[in-house]
Amino acid sequence: VTDDWYVDITTAKLIDPARRKDFKVFVLPNLYGDIITDEAAEFQGGVGTAGSANIGKKYAMFEAVHGSAPRMIKEGRGQYADPCSMLRASVMLLSHIGFQKQANALEAALDKCMLEEKKLVITGRADGCTCSEFGDYVMETITQMTK
């Protein structure tokens, strides 16, 4: 079933808990897609933690929702960028190409690191861990979980 909606009412209904579950797939031009995906990302932790997939008939692309964080680079904070968005996109990629076991392991490790243990905190600044430190934490967690 398909339905046509204006973007303004779509964004309003997306934050309505009673209607949110009605949305499964969005087909949108880039500008509206950026707006809707950023809004939807807030429900699971924000754009810093959301992966993105663009899947076509022949090709697919997986990326971080937040892009390359150029402002953080300009401000000298690039090493503190949140890797979770890219790692979530990697889960989607692994699943898409048939590596479901690896996708499940990475997703479980991310959930454990981000939501359960929280041994390292990503703040985007020097008071938090670096991208590399968090990546190492995730990899160590995968290793421990798959022993």
What are these regions (language model features)?
Residues 4, 25-26, 79-80, 99, ...:
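Hydrophobic alpha-helical scaffolding
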